Design a protein with these regions (language model features):
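Cofactor-binding loop segments of dinucleotide-utilizing enzymes, especially the Rossmann-like FAD-
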Residues: 1, 104
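Conserved SGNH/GDSL esterase-like catalytic core that processes O-acyl groups on lipids
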Residues: 2-82
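Extracellular glycan-modifying ectodomains
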Residues: 55-57, 74-82, 87-93, 106-113
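Structural beta-sheet core signal
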Residues: 69, 100-103
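A short helix->loop->beta-strand "cap" motif at the edges of active sites that frequently abuts
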Residues: 94-99, 124
Length: 175
């Protein structure tokens, strides 16, 4: 199925520098000039919660100061998600000095409860995000222009993209 996404950064950000990870890196560099953010798309883990975490992200997680777990929207199996998110949290804690976890952008009580439980039982900072989508108009619209990986503009024509946060929404997630 063609989902009309021609980029490798946060879906619905108009350009790479406006996705959540790149905006976060820019903010961190104001206070710690050599900060780097390494975005990892682990949607494959969200869709297959039993896949091997180490083979998916292990090489990227070694000796990090902080890992931010920002996922949940692609999780389909909410029955096994509570155990899976706890395993992911423990794995990340074994690799980084500090781990922070966010809730989902799209409100889903079941997923949110699992994330909150994992945060509380592992003494993590939890940052809710669903309020952004509920309170602000931070989704792109049909007809808005985005850019592909070659910086070529294209116009949004499908509804799938407009369920994701736009540049402003990405900024709010980063903050």
């Amino acid at each position: 199925e063609d989902i009309e996404w021609f980029s490798d950064w946060g879906m619905a950000a108009s350009n790479i520098e406006y996705d959540y990870c790149h905006q976060l890196e820019k903010m961190l560099c104001k206070y710690h000039p050599n900060s780097t953010v390494t975005p990892l798309n682990i949607a494959s883990w969200e869709r297959n919660l039993s896949c091997d975490i180490d083979s998916l992200i292990g090489s990227y997680c070694k000796n990090k100061d902080i890992i931010i777990i920002r996922l949940g929207e692609n999780v389909q199996d909410v029955t096994t998600f509570p155990d899976a998110i706890s395993r992911l949290v423990k794995y990340c804690q074994s690799k980084a000095k500090r781990v922070i976890i966010t809730g989902c952008f799209w409100k889903n009580d079941s997923k949110e409860r699992s994330i909150i439980h994992a945060a509380r039982t592992n003494d993590l900072t939890y940052v809710p995000l669903y309020w952004i989508d509920n309170l602000y108009n931070v989704r792109p619209q049909i007809g808005d222009t985005l850019y592909d990986i070659n910086k070529k503009p294209y116009v949004i024509t499908q509804d799938f993209i407009i369920t994701h946060p736009n540049d402003e929404g990405m900024q709010m997630i980063a903050e």
